[in-house]
A protein has these predicted regions:
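Bacterial N-terminal signal peptides that target proteins for export
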Residues: 2-20
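Enrichment for repetitive, rod-forming helical segments
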Residues: 11, 22-24, 48, 53
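Noncatalytic, solvent-exposed loop/strand surfaces
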Residues: 33-484
Length: 484
């Protein structure tokens, strides 16, 4: 693993330190200090865990949040909250900050975003840095997308960055590093922004100035609403966040627009940005490859072609980049014909160090811990390989197919499959320690598929389900598992 959060913090530039100060100054303090989650799965090794966190030793359910929404993206822990994006009715979007307090009950949602503020479906797991939450919107069926920056403490908007275009969507997680925000945008390639410099009403302002303006206007809207309620409560319309000005971050660079198709999350390590691009067979667009860019200007440093599409995105493991590939997308009906491979390339020049084919697709990120690469596949197996050589350490018995990434922490691996079975396994040999069936467990009773990988924070495991493929309306759930 090249880039633990502590290593990132020790190597950030002065600019990123100023950026962090701006975020703190621009926002009210949180009740609980949140651990940053600045990229997909929490870090470039894609462990799905807050640094130095341990997961649960048993499958005890602490709380369940039932819903009719479909949770495709993984949950994201953020201090005393867990953030979830979902598809609501008619493919509308929902984004919620849920309290992790087991006693929260019906008041679990601390704040939420929906229409009219969110205009496109959202399947992007957010990134969190200080009081800034960043997530994208749009799916394969939509054109054009918006990158959103909102406040963690209140959910109020900070900024938006729209990217128009056909087959443009932001499905992967953003990455926040060195004072920059980066995200893949489908046919828009990769976009790199400076969220410390915003355009508002034709003028450049910093993040703190923009928030002062937004707070003042939000207060005016609330005051007007309270005044109208006193005059005629039946016709008073609550204020909408969509009525606020929309500051726009400064574009630093954009690479690969019209050449690449970037649906997965990017990884940032040192002065490099690593991304994976797919080739869309139906639309005949994109480039099936792993690509290394220079963080400073987005110029291409190297490119490595691939046999299958790299839906899993990149994982950084020391001086290697690991990528899982699949011949099929996240479509259950296509699973019988899935083929795939894992490819390890040099972080420096993209040269292939090893590659192994498997009779299944790898559609979610590989997790790396203690020199071991752990990944799930559509054949229902969890595999652990040696990072340096690619040799197999262990493989679990086949069960239900997997779309979701594993989470790894403190000698344990946590996985969840398309039948809603959550397992805790030993990292050393893959032996099962505990299992929880979300469909049959008396505390949950919510059958569903898990698309977004489970995540770990402060001894707890969070997992969310979707039922897009269910012929009947079945409740979905966000589930918190922990020993206490």
């Amino acid at each position: 693993m090249t880039i633990k959060l502590s290593e990132m913090e020790s190597n950030v530039s002065l600019r990123s330190q100023v950026f962090a100060v701006l975020l703190v100054v621009a926002a009210c303090p949180l009740a609980t200090q949140a651990a940053d989650w600045p990229t997909a799965r929490g870090n470039a090794a894609r462990t799905g865990a807050v640094e130095n966190s341990a997961g649960p030793k048993s499958g005890r359910v602490l709380w369940v949040h039932k819903s009719t929404d479909h949770y495709i993206a993984a949950p994201v822990p953020a201090g005393d909250l867990v953030l979830v994006s979902s598809l609501a009715a008619f493919n509308t979007s929902s984004f919620q900050a849920l309290s992790i307090d087991p006693a929260a009950g019906a008041k679990r949602a601390r704040w939420s975003k929906a229409v009219p503020y969110l205009k496109l479906p959202t399947v992007s797991a957010p990134a969190v840095f200080g009081n800034l939450v960043v997530f994208g919107d749009g799916m394969h069926q939509t054109d054009g997308a918006i990158l959103h920056g909102v406040r963690l403490d209140t959910g109020l908007p900070l900024w938006q960055y729209p990217v128009p275009g056909q087959l443009v969507h932001m499905e992967g997680s953003p990455a926040i590093a060195n004072g920059r925000v980066l995200i893949g945008g489908g046919n828009a390639g990769v976009v790199c922004l400076d969220p410390g410099k915003l355009e508002l009403n034709g003028k450049e302002v910093d993040a703190a100035q923009a928030q002062v303006i937004l707070d003042a206007q939000w207060k005016e809207l609330q005051t007007k609403y309270e005044r109208e309620k006193k005059i005629d409560p039946d016709f008073a319309i609550p204020p909408s966040e969509d009525s606020l000005p929309k500051p726009k971050p400064k574009l630093v660079w954009q690479s690969g627009a019209g050449k690449w198709h970037v649906d997965s999350s990017v990884a940032v390590t040192g002065d490099r940005v690593i991304l994976t691009s797919a080739f869309l067979d139906v639309e005949k667009t994109g480039d099936r490859s792993i690509i290394g860019l220079k963080l400073a200007d987005g110029s291409e440093a190297w490119k490595t072609p691939l046999k299958h599409n790299p839906w899993a995105g990149p994982t950084i493991a020391g001086d290697l980049v690991l990528v899982g590939c699949s011949s099929v997308r996240l479509e259950p009906r296509d699973l019988p014909k899935a083929q795939g491979e894992v490819v390890a390339v040099s972080l420096t020049d993209g040269s292939v160090k090893w590659r192994n084919e498997i009779p299944a697709g790898v559609v979610s990120a590989i997790a790396v811990k203690d020199g071991i690469a752990v990944f799930t596949a559509t054949d229902g197996c969890v595999r652990a390989w040696d990072v340096a050589s690619g040799k197999e350490r262990w493989k679990s018995d086949p069960a239900a197919p997997f779309f979701a990434s594993p989470a790894v922490a403190d000698g344990m691996v946590y996985v969840a499959d398309l039948k809603g079975l959550v397992q805790g396994m030993k990292l050393s040999d893959g032996k099962q320690v505990w299992a929880l069936n979300l469909a049959t467990d008396s505390a949950v009773q919510a059958p569903g598929m898990v698309y977004g990988g489970p995540v770990i924070a402060a001894g707890r495991l969070y997992v969310a389900t979707c039922n897009l493929e269910s012929p009947t309306k079945v409740a979905t759930a966000v589930v918190c598992i922990g020993d206490k």
